[in-house]
Amino acid sequence: MAIEYALVVPGRTSPEEMASRLGLERGDFEVSKGVWTADLRRDRGFILTLRRAKDGYFESDDWTLEPDKYLHVGFRADKAAPPQVRDRNLLDLVERALATGDEDMAFIENGEVLVLERAGGELRRVPVGFWNNVEP
């Protein structure tokens, strides 16, 4: 079973804009029906997808997010990749997204575990198992 992560970016951020913010180019992606896919398994340990979506609902314990429109930045973790390397690479991209914009964002594991959130400019790390694999 794969581990899936999502960075949910409410608003109108486009896949093209986010790709650039993540240090990737249009040529790094295959685009089909509005879904941008970059196979980064060999170098980073995951497949990255970017897609616009609407009417989202995300829930974790007592936290919920219901964006009307949002960008879904998906990370499908390669189970063969070393977890520490893969998760550090994944977090590097999340941190880059945070550093290059001011939108609210939520980083979620397997569709149900909130790992990190920025809301109203405030950044909150949730104490979950993900952090065991990355150095601060």
Provide a role label for each language-model segment.
Residues 30-40, 106-111:
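A generic structural motif
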Residues 1-34, 135-136:
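Short, extreme N-terminal segment that most often corresponds to the first beta-strand
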Residues 12-14, 45, 82:
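Generic "edge-of-domain/loop-turn" microfeature
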Residues 34-56:
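Amphipathic, interaction-prone secondary-structure segments
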Residues 49-136:
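Charged interaction segments
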Residues 15-18, 37-38, 55, 77:
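Aromatic-enriched hydrophobic runs in primary sequence
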Residues 2, 7, 37-39, 60-64, ...:
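Generic structural signal for short, flexible, solvent-exposed coil/loop and linker residues
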